[in-house]
């Protein structure tokens, strides 16, 4: 140690080391000190804090084992996440980095002589050693150290196995200590901190009491955070107090009750002086003999204990949970001398309930260093701390909690700051502490200063503290101090005493005596009730305190934002700060509340206790981290702290107001709690029926949570976060807010969390109110009346809708898997810094705890996205309407009619009516699945409210689909769909009809239909109509009937009916609807294309996870345009095999919806037709709508759905599709793309989604592009779909031609597998931006691909149908013939993203093989059709390339679409002809390419990645937003390139790399398509590679080659970005590099033969499309330039291909 300290393995420091020296606190560095000292340093903790376990005289002891206990030996753990397990074993939830304050002041020897505390500790970990001159205590200390050594050894072992058995090791250690100290074990019960990951059961070093035989040894489970920050070991100079051991975490002093009482007496003095410091935040041992010797280092506070009284005071941050400790603390609290009694922990497992409450209290505070805020209060309440050695451990681990709270009071910003706190002349430097904020530190400094602490913490009376001992809440009422302590105890019990103490400190200022036990109980409840306004709190208490915490938090923030407005959320910074400071204290408080809730508290307590001991340990740590993040995200929202909140609890604490502000906020909160306790009671009474119902549901929820086995944990975490929100609510009291919370509680725990999301998501007060109303309805899934009541109460406050949102979210979380939600939430949280977003994040955290943290977070991310959209959309009425429909949906689970009525009511609303109806259908849709699913949907729909009414409808369909498939998907998709809502109010009427549809049909069908109806609203009525047929497919005649009901709605209502018929159509017969759609004019064609894609996705019935990912992607896409919004809806639909399909179709329709009201009428007619369940009627309805320009789109969507289900119908519609209007087709295409992504795994969907989102901002086509991706992902191979989607998006920007090419590719993929349809949609999307004709051609292409089962017929029909689109029929034919190529393309696209590629390659490998055999023939036979595409390409160059399949692309590119690409294609094809010879007879460009594809099937397989990259590059070009996505797509493409390279050849890989380079510039896809044309050589090399590639060596080689090719291609991206001419030059260079790489590949041909076969087909298809696209976009001259270098390469490749083709033949076979 510094100052010449000699390392002795010195967790225990030998006083003899400095016998004559002036006692001082030596700072132990976290790592270097440990290294120098030779002690074992655990730097893996929060910061580089090392757990310095120095024992005995073993200087080099890494383990810190005690040698023979020396009188001077003292164990001094460096502060890190709890002294004991600061590190690896206990990931620091509090201490996030070196900046966190981890210093632990250990005072050894007689602290009376303590002269000074050494300066600031090493950033995060500082060990302050106070060495006393008097070493008389050392023998006792040595004895205690001997005991400690054993315990520490056990703990050390636990630390080594930190992640495995930290509690087990501690347990065993405590057991040993118990055996050693039977008396003390009885007297001092081991307290177990229940911190999910940070809780550490630490047996405190028990200094052997010289006078007392009792060995103070208590198992002290301390949150590593609290310990790491708050732990201070204060040893009394007396041998007994010398025995007052220092424990790595809070020292659980196991002294006799006498000792404890004595210590308590000693502690009250310090508490009166620095009660908060010693009792709460200062988790270190308190010097007992030295009045100034007591040093509290953990939270920057320092407490001085009177030196006259030596006590082994182990200040355990609010970790004291077991009842045994409660007993011990009762004794201690009698003395009220040791605010560190919380360190004493009774058997954590023996008294589970007490431990649960304690763990809840202490773990929340300990885990969340926001407890440091309470630590500040606890410093005041340290005197109040009932925790004493003589007092049994109670839920009031006030001392420990105080430490944690105090640190929480210290804002994270203060972590980096060194705060010099002078306590009785003791300057203590606190290095930046994670939980310390500057303001908090200032407050702490004031608090730490004896006068200041007393002032800020008026509840600190020394005398009172002895009366306030932690006496298991019995002594609470003994005196005011006791009552205050009880209040704190209640808060601590519910939320670790320190949190409560912090609140009580202020409350004590206001109502110290009044609130005693009652206030304590009501505070444990009422504090959250302050935020929840009693009712909600009670419900939460009944169901889960954690949920209420999250609910409160969200609503409190919402209330603040409502009071101040979204912009005012920053204005509510004091409240937010309070919430931030309180949140962790609230976390434990929540838990305490869960124990204390009037009726449900016992239920909650027991399961939570178990969860606290079991899951809460690991989960609460994560929950606390997440909770701190949540608090940070939610509370900083008012302060624009979303980023910091989301990112880290530190920002949360940083953003937390200064300690003074916190104190003020707490004081106001205390007043609010007092008033709210009454208000809560009143609210509970007013919502009595709801509350009762809710309480029953809360029990039910508890059961459900138990079923989930982590619901209680989630509820606890939610309560914790809700505590923070409650603090905010208290700061900003609002009867409406209380009512709102009550209504949210009415909903359920999950509803509560969702309510928070709503509050955050719905900035408008009116919107919030509307949302809250539906929340009540959601809560009353069992009885509609109750939810209605909840609605009435929730309407009072603006945050009601957010409350209902929270409900849904909670339910959704419970229903769905939490992992995906967590992922989405994390991304969303980070992405969305908006206050609303952070608020939503807070809720998801709670939900996360409720089910799985990950799942809810993912969902929450969706909410965040919605929040951002809400912020973007200032509309309040829509949000309100949305909130109501959600409630109605939930109620509809009980009775569908009620949701309809609610929908009607919402519709009746003047300006909010449209959005409200939308919300209602959503609620109904959700209800059928389950209350949880409903909650998810509702919360999502609530979030979109702020943006637009249309946006809301989109949210609902997604939610429904997700509910059908799985809660997880629902949550994610829901938030995605919410984003699309912003477009228009059209969605509102649509949502209402949808709701009716859902109500009309089965609950599930209703949900799906409603969702679908909502989704189409955003884009246009025509999209809605398209959506309706799809919905029909899912919910048969019932959905149609509902659609009919919707018809009465205004013009928008017309679109609603259309959606319903669609839904029924999807349900009953997608094929049938497809056939009726066929007659639809070209305009209609576009929507049908979308629908078939969705239907294809239906067939695949993607996983919920992939749906979730897609939704996230969708969200990103939706933000830019309505099309992207529709895409999100489609994704959601895809999730459920049945409902997903219907929803997807609805979404597809939804994307066309934006066109016009005609679509609405079309939907209406469709609904009627579906009611009759006649396909002809549906077709007629489409025809009827055909007069309307956008109706055709809807009918065409139906037609597309039919095509998907029936190849013949798909072929028929292919012709019809071509006429689709350019705009509508783009929308429908967008949806398919999104769906494509949805199909794939969440991982693959996410990359696509990212690309999609980025591209969406560019234009609606890009947005629509995002959708098709999702369907493709959802469909069969999500991996391939993302790459393809990226390619399509990129192609969009370059040219319609490239888009058209992409679209055929997509279709081809759909034909071999449903996945191909998403690809087609991508193509459509890409076509959209260029022109309408290209879109139509894309659709026709998709149709043939979709009907790949009958490839020949389909391509022909589509060719004829798309003839007006020059490139449609050729591409369609090619697509039909080369369905395998579509699959191959898809594989290539998948290869663009490695994850997708891996999953899809396997599926497509078989298909590719099949197609490679039968696909080569079609390719060969297609040369003529390819020539047609060439011709068509000439007319609409871009379109032609787009519509063409792989061959079509090549042909089109070769034909020269009117762009230079054709020339390049021709040149490439000429090269191909030269190389292959077999294909040379083809049309100069197309035939050559086809020959190349046939011959160089493997080469083409490798090529696709290049074209895809080009496409992505184009998308990049198109818009800056696309660029980000393109980057993601480019990365995906590169990844897929790796996969393709692995399967194909090194050149293919290099090609992929080069193409991504080109891709980045965003040149038109056509240009890159030229590359694709030259890629057949690469394909040949890929084939060769694949033979030898089975080992990944070829991939590396390809990478190397691609680097060489990338150099040449690097220019090409630039040129591509510049223009087609530029592209040609890079292509030439790229071609050259391709040739070189191909040569290299020739050397590597044997690597992956099988892969080559599969990939060759795949590449053939994808590169053909891409090449055509590139050629169409690239000037012929440009392409010709590359042709020259390519020819030599082709010749070389001709040889290689001879080999490669032989390999391909083998692979294909």
From Swiss-Prot:
Keyword field: Cytoplasmic vesicle
Name it: Acrosomal protein KIAA1210
Q: Where is this region: Disordered?
A: 207-226, 239-275, 451-663, 763-973, 1211-1382, 1408-1516, 1539-1571, 1589-1653
- Where found? Cytoplasmic vesicle, Secretory vesicle, Acrosome
GO CC terms on record?
A: acrosomal vesicle
Ranges of Basic and acidic residues compositional bias? 473-490, 651-663, 1542-1552
Q: Which organism is it from?
A: Homo sapiens
In this chain, composition skew of type Low complexity spans 595-608, 1502-1513
Among InterPro entries, the record links this protein to: CRACD-like (IPR026713), DUF4592 (IPR028030)
**Bias-annotated ranges (Polar residues):** 494-505, 514-527, 886-941, 1288-1299, 1332-1350, 1366-1376, 1457-1469
């Amino acid at each position: 140690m510094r100052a010449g300290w000699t390392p002795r393995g010195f967790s225990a420091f030998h006083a003899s080391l400095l016998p004559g020296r002036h006692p001082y606190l030596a700072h132990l560095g976290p790592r270097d000190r440990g290294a120098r000292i030779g002690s074992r340093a655990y730097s893996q903790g929060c910061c580089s804090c090392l757990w310095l376990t120095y024992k005995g005289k073993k200087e080099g002891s890494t383990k810190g084992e005690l040698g023979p206990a020396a009188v001077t030996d003292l164990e001094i753990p460096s502060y890190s996440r709890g002294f004991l397990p600061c590190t690896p074993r206990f990931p620091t939830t509090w201490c996030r980095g070196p900046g966190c304050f981890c210093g632990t002041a250990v005072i050894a020897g007689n602290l009376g002589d303590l002269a000074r505390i050494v300066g600031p500790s090493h950033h995060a970990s500082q060990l302050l050693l106070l060495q006393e001159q008097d070493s008389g205590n050392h023998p006792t200390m040595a004895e205690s150290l001997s005991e400690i050594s054993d315990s520490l050894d056990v703990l050390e072992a636990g630390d080594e196995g930190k992640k495995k058995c930290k509690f087990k090791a501690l347990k065993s250690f405590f057991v040993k200590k118990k055996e050693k100290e039977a008396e003390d074990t009885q007297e001092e019960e081991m307290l177990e901190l229940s911190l999910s990951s940070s809780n550490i059961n630490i047996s405190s070093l028990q200094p052997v009491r010289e006078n007392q035989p009792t060995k103070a040894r208590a198992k002290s489970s301390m949150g590593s955070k609290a310990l790491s920050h708050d732990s201070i070991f204060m040893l009394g100079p007396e041998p007994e107090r010398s025995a007052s051991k220092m424990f790595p975490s809070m020292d659980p002093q196991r002294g006799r009750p006498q000792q404890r009482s004595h210590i308590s007496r000693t502690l009250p003095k310090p508490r009166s002086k620095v009660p908060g410091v010693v009792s709460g935040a200062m988790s270190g041992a308190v010097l007992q003999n030295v009045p100034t010797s007591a040093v509290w280092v953990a939270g920057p506070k320092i407490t001085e204990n009177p030196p006259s009284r030596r006590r082994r005071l182990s200040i355990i941050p609010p970790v004291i949970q077991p009842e045994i400790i409660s007993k011990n603390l009762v004794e201690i609290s009698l003395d009220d001398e040791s605010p560190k009694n919380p360190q004493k922990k009774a058997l954590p497992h023996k008294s589970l309930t007490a431990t649960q409450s304690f763990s809840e209290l202490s773990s929340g505070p300990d885990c969340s260093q926001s407890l440091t805020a309470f630590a500040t209060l606890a410093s005041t309440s340290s005197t109040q701390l009932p925790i004493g050695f003589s007092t049994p451990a109670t839920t009031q681990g006030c001392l420990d909690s105080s430490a944690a709270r105090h640190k929480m009071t210290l804002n994270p910003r203060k972590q980096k700051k060194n705060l010099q706190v002078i306590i009785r002349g003791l300057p203590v430097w606190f290095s930046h502490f994670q939980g310390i904020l500057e303001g908090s530190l200032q407050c702490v400094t004031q608090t730490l200063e004896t006068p200041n602490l007393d002032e800020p913490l008026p509840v600190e009376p020394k005398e009172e503290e002895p009366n306030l001992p932690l006496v298991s809440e019995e002594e609470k009422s003994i005196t005011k101090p006791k009552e205050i302590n009880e209040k704190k105890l209640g808060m601590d019990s519910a939320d670790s005493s320190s949190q409560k103490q912090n609140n009580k400190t202020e409350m004590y200022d206001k109502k110290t005596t009044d609130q005693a036990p009652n206030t304590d109980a009501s505070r444990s409840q009422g504090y959250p009730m302050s935020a929840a306004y009693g009712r909600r709190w009670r419900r939460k208490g009944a169901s889960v305190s954690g949920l209420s915490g999250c609910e409160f938090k969200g609503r409190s923030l919402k209330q603040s934002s409502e009071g101040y407005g979204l912009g005012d959320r920053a204005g509510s910074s004091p409240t937010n700060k309070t919430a931030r400071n309180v949140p962790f204290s609230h976390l434990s408080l929540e838990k305490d509340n869960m124990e204390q809730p009037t009726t449900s508290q016992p239920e909650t307590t027991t399961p939570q206790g178990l969860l606290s001991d079991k899951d809460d340990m690991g989960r609460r740590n994560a929950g606390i981290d997440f909770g701190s993040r949540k608090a940070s995200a939610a509370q900083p929202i008012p302060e624009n702290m979303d980023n910091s909140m989301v990112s880290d609890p530190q920002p949360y604490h940083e953003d937390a107001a200064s300690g003074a502000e916190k104190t003020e906020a707490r004081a106001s909160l205390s007043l609010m709690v007092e008033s709210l306790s009454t208000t809560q009671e009143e609210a509970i009474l007013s919502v009595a029926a709801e509350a009762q119902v809710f309480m029953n549901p809360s029990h039910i929820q508890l059961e459900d949570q138990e079923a989930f086995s982590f619901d209680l944990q989630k509820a606890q975490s939610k309560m914790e976060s809700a505590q923070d929100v409650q603090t905010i609510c208290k700061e900003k009291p609002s009867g409406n807010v209380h009512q709102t919370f009550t209504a949210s509680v009415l909903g359920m725990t999950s509803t509560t969390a969702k309510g928070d999301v709503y509050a955050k998501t719905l900035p408008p007060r009116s919107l919030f109110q509307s949302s809250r109303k539906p929340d009540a309805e959601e809560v009353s899934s069992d009885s509609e009346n109750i939810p209605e009541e909840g609605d009435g109460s929730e309407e009072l406050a603006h945050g009601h809708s957010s409350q209902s949102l929270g409900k849904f979210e909670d339910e959704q979380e419970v229903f769905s898997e939490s992992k995906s939600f967590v992922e989405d939430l994390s991304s969303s949280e980070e992405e969305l810094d908006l206050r609303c977003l952070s608020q939503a994040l807070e809720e998801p955290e709670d939900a996360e705890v409720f089910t799985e943290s990950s799942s809810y977070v993912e969902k929450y991310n969706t909410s965040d996205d919605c929040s951002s959209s809400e912020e973007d959309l200032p509309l309040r009425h829509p949000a309100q309407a949305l909130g109501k429909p959600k409630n109605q949906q939930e109620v509809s689970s009980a009775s569908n009619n009620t949701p309809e009525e609610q929908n009607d009511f919402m519709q009746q609303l003047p300006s909010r009516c449209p959005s409200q109806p939308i919300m209602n259908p959503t609620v109904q849709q959700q209800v059928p699945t389950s209350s949880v699913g409903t909650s998810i949907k509702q919360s999502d729909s609530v979030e979109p409210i702020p943006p637009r009414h249309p946006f809301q409808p989109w949210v609902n369909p997604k939610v429904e689909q997700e509910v059908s498939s799985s809660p997880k998907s629902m949550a994610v998709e829901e938030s995605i769909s919410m984003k699309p809502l912003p477009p228009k109010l059209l969605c509102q009427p649509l949502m209402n009809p949808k709701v009716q549809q859902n109500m009309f049909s089965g609950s599930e069908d209703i949900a799906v239909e409603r969702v679908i109806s909502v989704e189409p609203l955003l884009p246009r009525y025509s999209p809605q109509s398209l959506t309706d047929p799809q919905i029909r497919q899912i919910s048969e005649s019932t959905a149609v009937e509902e659609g009919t009901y919707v018809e009465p709605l205004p013009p928008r209502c017309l679109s609603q009916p259309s959606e319903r018929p669609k839904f029924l159509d999807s349900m009953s017969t997608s094929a049938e609807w497809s056939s009726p759609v066929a007659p639809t004019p070209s305009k209609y064609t576009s929507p049908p294309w979308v629908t078939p894609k969705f239907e294809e996705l239906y067939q695949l019935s993607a996983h919920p996870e992939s749906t979730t990912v897609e939704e996230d992607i969708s969200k990103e896409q939706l933000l830019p345009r309505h099309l992207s919004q529709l895409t999100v809806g489609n994704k959601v639909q895809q999730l459920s095999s049945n409902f997903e399909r219907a929803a997807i179709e609805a979404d597809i329709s939804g994307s066309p919806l934006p066109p016009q009201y005609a679509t609405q009428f079309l939907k209406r007619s469709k609904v009627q037709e579906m009611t009759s369940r006649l396909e002809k009627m549906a077709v007629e309805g489409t025809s009827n709508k055909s007069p309307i320009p956008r109706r055709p789109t809807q009918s065409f969507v139906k037609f597309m759905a039919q095509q998907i289900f029936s190849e013949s119908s798909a072929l028929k519609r292919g012709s019809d599709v071509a006429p689709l209007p350019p705009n509508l087709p783009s929308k429908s295409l967008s949806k398919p793309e999104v769906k494509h992504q949805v199909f794939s795994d969440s991982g693959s969907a996410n990359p696509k989604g990212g690309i999609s989102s980025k591209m969406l901002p560019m234009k609606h086509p890009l947005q629509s592009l995002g959708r098709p991706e999702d369907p493709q992902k959802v469909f069969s191979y999500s991996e391939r779909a993302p790459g393809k989607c990226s390619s399509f998006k990129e192609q969009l920007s370059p040219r319609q031609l490239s888009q058209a090419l992409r679209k055929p590719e997509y279709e081809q993929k759909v034909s071999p597998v449903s996945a191909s349809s998403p690809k087609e949609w991508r193509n459509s999307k890409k076509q959209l931006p260029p022109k309408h004709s290209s879109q139509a051609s894309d659709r026709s292409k998709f149709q043939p691909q979709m009907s790949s089962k009958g490839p020949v017929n389909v391509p022909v029909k589509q060719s004829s149908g798309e003839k007006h689109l020059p490139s449609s029929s050729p591409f369609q034919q090619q697509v039909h013939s080369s369905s395998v190529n579509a699959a191959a393309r898809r594989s290539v696209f998948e290869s663009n993203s490695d994850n997708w590629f891996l999953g899809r390659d396997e599926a497509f490998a078989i298909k590719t093989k099949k197609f490679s055999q039968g696909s080569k023939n079609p390719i060969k036979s297609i040369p003529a059709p390819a020539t047609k595409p060439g011709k068509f390409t000439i007319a609409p160059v871009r379109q032609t390339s787009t519509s063409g399949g792989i061959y079509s692309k090549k042909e089109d590119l070769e034909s020269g679409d009117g762009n230079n690409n054709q020339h390049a294609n021709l040149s490439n094809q000429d090269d191909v002809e030269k190389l292959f010879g077999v294909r040379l007879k083809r049309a100069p460009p197309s035939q050559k390419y086809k020959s190349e594809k046939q011959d160089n099937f493997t080469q083409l397989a490798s090529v696709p990645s290049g074209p895809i990259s080009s496409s992505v590059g184009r998308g990049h070009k198109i818009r800056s937003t696309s660029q980000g996505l393109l980057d993601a797509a480019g990365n995906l493409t590169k990844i897929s390139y790796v996969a393709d390279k692995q399967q194909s050849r090194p050149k293919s890989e290099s090609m992929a790399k080069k193409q991504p380079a080109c891709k980045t510039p965003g040149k038109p896809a056509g240009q890159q398509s030229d590359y694709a044309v030259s890629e057949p050589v690469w394909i040949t090399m890929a084939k060769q590679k694949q033979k030898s590639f089975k080992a990944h060596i070829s991939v590396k080689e390809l990478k190397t080659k691609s680097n060489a090719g990338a150099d040449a291609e690097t220019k090409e991206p630039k040129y591509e970005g510049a223009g087609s001419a530029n592209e040609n030059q890079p292509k030439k260079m790229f071609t050259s590099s391709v040739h070189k790489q191909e040569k290299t590949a020739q050397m590597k041909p044997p690597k992956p033969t099988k892969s080559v076969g599969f990939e060759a087909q795949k590449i053939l298809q994808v590169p053909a499309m891409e090449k055509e696209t590139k050629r169409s976009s690239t000037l012929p001259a440009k392409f010709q330039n590359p042709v020259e270098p390519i020819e030599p390469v082709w010749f070389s490749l001709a040889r290689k291909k001879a080999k490669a083709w032989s390999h391909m033949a083998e692979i294909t076979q």
